[in-house]
Every structure is written in C-alpha cells, then in structure tokens.
C-alpha cells in the first residue's frame, strides 16, 4: 500500500483548535467494521452502545508540560520538546534552534534552571538537569503543555486541564491519548453503574506520534518506540471478558497498541507486558485482543489512520472520513470521536 492511499483533503476550519465547553459534548460517528454502516450520534450515546460485562481499557498516562524555552550560552534562543524522561535528571528531547547545541554546552532555561547537553542520538538530544530538583519538578514549574503543531496557537492555562484525561495517573506522555479526553467522571460512573468493567494500561505517547510518514511504501515505515505497561490484573480481566463472550473495547489507538503489543510479545496469548513497543498496525494486521475502539479523527497519511483502517477496513474508514468532512465533524486532538467495531477477517 502507498502512504498516499491514506490521504484526504481537510478544510482548515474543521481542525478543532479548542476543546468543547464540556468534555462529553462532542459528536460521535459510529462505524460498523463488517458492513461499513455509519450513524451520526452524540458522545453521550456511547452509554447505550457498551454492554454490561464489556471491558473498556483506558490509557492512564499523564501528559507532562514537555515544552521548554531557553537559550544557549551564546544567547541564541531554543525550544526543547521532551521525547521521554530517562530518569529523574535526564531527558531525550527534540531541540529547535538556529544551530544545534554542542556536547557539554550549557542551556539556560526560563526560570533560571540549567541543563547540560550530554550526548546526541541521531535527531534526539540527551540533556541533563543541573539542579537539586527532578526533571518533573522543573517541567511542572516552567514547562508548557505540548499542544500538537496543527492546533497552531500558544498553550493557555485551560490546556493544563483539558489536554489531559480525568483519569490520568502516570506522568510521561508528551501528547494526550485523545480518545480519553471525551470522558468525564460522571460518564465513567454511569458506565460502571451499568455493569461495564473498566481497566487501565499505560502508554507514554511520544512526540513521534506527530512525525509524518516519510516513505512512499507503508511497509518501509519504521515506527517510533514508546514505553507501555499492561499489568497482570488487566490480562486477567481480558481473559474473563473473552470467556464470558463479551467485548474488549479499547479507548484510543494507544490502548489498542498497548494490548496488541502485549499479545505480540507473547505470540498471541496475552501476558503482562512492560517495556518499549514499536508496533506498527496497518491493513492486513490480525487483531488478537480488541473487539471495538473509540478514537478521534486522525491526520491524513498518519500511522493512526492506518491502524483504524486495519481495524475496520480501508474502504470503510476512508468513506467514514469523507462522511465526517461532509457533516462537518471536528478533527484531531480536540475534535470529535468515532466508535468503531472490528471487521471480521
């Protein structure tokens, strides 16, 4: 398959640059992966689509304020975007400046903090904090929320809350698991009251999620690596759910990738998993665990639209996106959502 097969023209006004006033006020496009049938709904209608005994799996990563501003010793300005935290003092990061900082040079951050350029790893820089504080403490003090490039505005105070799920727990993501942004506490309580089971995995979404695919042939793409954790209690819940003939519903592509990574690591039989994953899901992939998913509308030619196409069928997904454009759904991180059931292979 060609990467350009996943292209579509999106009017600029359909890119959501701000979230809705209420989390669950978004629209919801449902797609039946077997038939291609579409239905226009509200996100709150999801309550009627998830059945008692179904298991919903959420990604509980917490977005860190991963964008830092500062200057080199020479006075040149730079911008740092954390890719991942290596430990309490060291990060791997993208650095934007007129000239790359040299090894052992000092970077002066806003707020008076300093970092040393320790090493370079291809396009990423290893930076070391020169402070008694931890990286996380400095990020919380002077970091900015790492809004995606297409939102095309400076971050605001409201983004600290809204570019974050209500159930976030484990700091480490530099992009939000956006399907989860639609859920508020009341909706989670309503799902539980209905008898829906809730479980949490962790995948620290990296900045690589916004990198364009730079090859023509889908098969030649090398996926970026992210850290994921699927604990034993989730594995047990999935086994019980499958045994009872109920569905595993993944909230977001990151939850899908976490569960399928765990299944891949143990060759199909799901076992607990913790470590880096570079799983790349595109049409032809056989899903082992997930039966239905909730996801936002993704960028053209992105690995995320490829994943959804693998799940529900390429033709069905591309037709759904054209429908969404015609019906003026809101796209990308702060936009509307889809509820998609898996196409039988």
Swiss-Prot record:
S-adenosyl-L-methionine among keywords: yes
The EC number(s) this enzyme carries: 2.4.99.17
Reactions that this protein is recorded to catalyse: 7-aminomethyl-7-carbaguanosine(34) in tRNA + S-adenosyl-L-methionine = epoxyqueuosine(34) in tRNA + adenine + L-methionine + 2 H(+)
Annotated metabolic or biological route of this protein: tRNA modification; tRNA-queuosine biosynthesis
Molecular functions (GO terms): S-adenosylmethionine:tRNA ribosyltransferase-isomerase activity
EC top class named in words: transferase
Function text: Transfers and isomerizes the ribose moiety from AdoMet to the 7-aminomethyl group of 7-deazaguanine (preQ1-tRNA) to give epoxyqueuosine (oQ-tRNA).
Protein family (similarity comment): Belongs to the QueA family.
UniProt protein name: S-adenosylmethionine:tRNA ribosyltransferase-isomerase
Source organism (scientific name): Shewanella sp. (strain MR-4)
């Amino acid at each position: 398959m060609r990467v350009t097969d996943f292209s579509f023209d999106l009017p600029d006004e359909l890119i959501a640059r701000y979230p809705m006033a209420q989390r669950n006020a978004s629209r919801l496009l449902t797609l039946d992966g077997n038939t291609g049938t579409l239905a226009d709904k509200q996100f709150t209608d999801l309550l009627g689509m998830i059945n008692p005994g179904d298991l919903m799996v959420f990604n509980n990563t917490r977005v860190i304020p991963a964008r830092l501003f500062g200057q080199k010793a020479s006075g040149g300005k730079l911008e740092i975007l954390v890719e991942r935290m290596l430990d309490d003092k060291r990060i791997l990061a993208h650095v934007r400046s007129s000239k790359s900082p040299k090894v052992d040079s000092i970077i002066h951050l806003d707020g008076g903090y300093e970092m040393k350029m320790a090493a370079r790893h291809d396009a990423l820089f290893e930076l070391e904090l020169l402070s008694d504080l931890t990286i996380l403490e400095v990020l919380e003090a002077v970091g900015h929320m790492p809004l995606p490039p297409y939102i095309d505005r400076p971050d605001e105070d409201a983004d600290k809350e809204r570019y974050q799920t209500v159930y976030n727990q484990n700091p480490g993501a530099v992009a939000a698991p956006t399907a989860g942004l639609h859920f508020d506490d009341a909706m989670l309580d309503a799902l539980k009251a209905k008898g829906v089971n809730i479980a949490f995995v962790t995948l620290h979404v990296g900045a690589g999620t916004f990198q364009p695919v730079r090859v023509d042939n889908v098969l030649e793409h090398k996926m970026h690596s992210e850290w994921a954790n699927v604990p034993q209690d989730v594995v047990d819940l999935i086994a019980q759910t499958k045994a009872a003939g109920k569905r595993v519903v993944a909230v977001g592509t990151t939850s899908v990738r976490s569960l399928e990574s765990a299944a891949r690591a143990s060759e199909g039989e799901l076992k607990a998993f913790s470590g880096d994953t570079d799983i790349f899901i595109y049409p032809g992939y056989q899903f082992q665990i997930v039966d239905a998913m909730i996801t936002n509308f993704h960028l053209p030619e992105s690995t995320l639209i490829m994943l959804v196409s693998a799940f529900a069928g390429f033709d069905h997904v591309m037709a759904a996106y054209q429908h969404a454009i015609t019906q003026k759904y809101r796209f990308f991180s702060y936009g509307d959502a889809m509820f998609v059931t898996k196409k039988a292979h």
